[in-house]
Amino acid sequence: MAGRESDAVSLAGVVLAGGESRRMGRDKATLVLPGGSTTMVEHVLGIVGQRCEPVFVMAAQGQPLPPLQVPVLRDELRGLGPLPATGRGLRAAAEAGARFAFVCAVDMPGLTVDLIDDLVRSAIETDAEVVLPWDGRSHYLAAIYRTDLAERVDALVAAGERKMSALADSSDTQRIVMSDSAPLANVNTAADLPAPVRPGH
């Protein structure tokens, strides 16, 4: 698209790859997508990396991953969901000098750079702390977060919060209505996999 907003703002990427994948029955990050040899984590990194720099992968302790050209940070707290991993990713992004981070789940093969651009545009225009896509529900793991929210995440986790909604509810949050839900779709079973997968654009 003309005038990539992500070029005008310091935007890091945080890909959450350490989920337990109970319904899939196997690690989603290393799932090979139909029509090739690319794993889910490599596919999502290929999209996020077009708009975000640096990009961090949050993974579970001992979780096997293919060789990646980005930093991999291992979960310090196991079994607590995506909130503490998001906080650690935001802190790493802040330390790298980024003001915003696009945080997403690893199981989003339909993710597009256009979605990232739309969210970044809103973040710039509103200076909101959180910008979420909304298609009838809020998508917390395909959203823009200010990196200075890392301390707020720590406080929420220390208070016993586990849900990403707790961070959005305690922040200046903007929601963007999405007419196309395809880029937001998660893969929970093999039947959810698209075939073939097209690179996001």
Swiss-Prot record:
It catalyses: Mo-molybdopterin + GTP + H(+) = Mo-molybdopterin guanine dinucleotide + diphosphate. Mg(2+) binds at D107. GO terms for biological process: Mo-molybdopterin cofactor biosynthetic process. GO terms for molecular function: GTP binding; metal ion binding; molybdenum cofactor guanylyltransferase activity. InterPro entries: MobA-like_NTP_Trfase (IPR025877), Molybde_CF_guanTrfase (IPR013482), Nucleotide-diphossugar_trans (IPR029044). GTP binds at L16, A17, G18, K28, D75, D107. One of its GO terms (cellular component) is cytoplasm. Its EC number is 2.7.7.77. It is found in: Cytoplasm. Its cofactor is Mg(2+). It holds the Pfam family NTP_transf_3. Keywords: Cytoplasm, GTP-binding, Magnesium, Metal-binding, Molybdenum cofactor biosynthesis, Nucleotide-binding, Transferase. SUPFAM superfamilies: Nucleotide-diphospho-sugar transferases. The keyword Methyltransferase does not apply. Its main location: cytoplasm. Transfers a GMP moiety from GTP to Mo-molybdopterin (Mo-MPT) cofactor (Moco or molybdenum cofactor) to form Mo-molybdopterin guanine dinucleotide (Mo-MGD) cofactor. The N-terminal domain determines nucleotide recognition and specific binding, while the C-terminal domain determines the specific binding to the target protein. Belongs to the MobA family. NCBIfam families: PRK00576.1. This is Probable molybdenum cofactor guanylyltransferase.
